[in-house]
Design a protein with these regions (language model features):
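N-terminal subdomain of nucleotide-sugar transferases
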Residues: 1-53
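Conserved nucleotide-sugar phosphate-binding/catalytic loop shared by glycosyltransferases and other
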Residues: 33-82, 160-163
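Generic beta-sheet signal
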Residues: 35-37, 54, 133-135, 209, ...
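Short, charged, surface-exposed secondary-structure boundary motifs
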Residues: 60-68, 140-147, 236-239
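Alpha-helical membrane-targeting segments
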Residues: 80-84, 146-187
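Conserved nucleotide-sugar donor-interacting segment of glycosyltransferase catalytic cores
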Residues: 88-160, 213-214
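A nucleotide-sugar donor-handling region in carbohydrate enzymes
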Residues: 169-245
Length: 245
């Protein structure tokens, strides 16, 4: 039996598929612990997973839902600035609180949501193997794939590939302050530097709930990238178990 930890955003759209994966691992005899802010506990209360609270001082009960409500009222640059500040705060919290909690829980392997960019660095710091889980659209970048936040159509022509790359450059520029938090933490922990965003994804395995038939044609998919792994039997639900960590 392995002790498997989960790091993922508190949004239900990320928690549901991640819990589905965790439940299947439970069925196979492993212990699964999800590390999250206080209000995540209620959201996964019928998942059978164990829960370890982190980040309560930064994100008290109700703060995540309040954040999403505020974000829903914003548009354009104001919305982007608000989201960036939230993700910077979340990243700093994870770097501060998650390592000790994961150590105390004696975790053997981490499942990390693809958008939890701090997760790979935490795993590297703890010398733990980790798997990247794409609970939303895969955001792996390559010239032929339009940026995930656009409505651009796929076209296998030079100008579309140039457009896609410019879109990715713009995204990296606008979110550079989030990336800087990760880069700085790797320096503090004396870890090898990451030069591009995809460096934070696992080289052991990346798994996606999106079937290949529904994704854009990818030319640079890693051999450790796996798709459509969500065909699980429906388990019997019980109450969540809180653990000390």
């Amino acid at each position: 039996m392995s002790r498997i930890g989960i790091l993922c955003p508190g949004a239900i759209g990320h928690l549901n598929p991640m819990c589905n994966l965790g439940i299947e691992l439970l069925r196979r005899g492993h212990k699964v612990i999800l590390f999250g802010v206080p209000e995540v506990e209620e959201k996964i209360s019928q998942s059978n997973l164990e829960f370890c609270e982190i980040g309560g001082s930064d994100f008290p009960l109700g703060s995540i839902e309040t954040m999403y409500a505020q974000l829903g009222q914003l548009t354009g640059l104001e919305g982007l600035k608000f989201a960036i500040q939230f993700f910077k705060k979340e990243g700093n919290m994870l770097f501060r609180d998650a390592p000790n909690a994961i150590r105390n829980a004696q975790i053997d392997l981490l499942l990390i949501d693809q958008v939890t960019s701090a997760g790979g660095t935490i795993a590297d710091y703890l010398n733990l193997p980790f798997i990247t889980v794409c609970n939303a659209l895969p955001i792996n970048k390559e010239p032929g794939v339009p940026p995930y936040f656009t409505h651009w159509r796929y076209k296998d022509v030079w100008w579309a590939k140039l457009r896609n790359q410019l879109g990715n450059v713009l995204t990296n520029y606008l979110t550079r302050s989030i990336w800087d938090v990760l880069v700085q933490q790797r320096k503090i922990w004396h870890l090898p530097p990451h030069y591009k965003r995809d460096d934070s994804y696992s080289k052991l395995a990346q798994i996606s709930q999106l079937p290949q038939e529904l994704d854009f044609p990818r030319q640079k998919i890693a051999p450790w990238f796996h798709v459509d792994v969500a065909n699980y039997k429906k388990p019997a639900f019980h109450n969540i178990k809180r653990v000390d960590c």
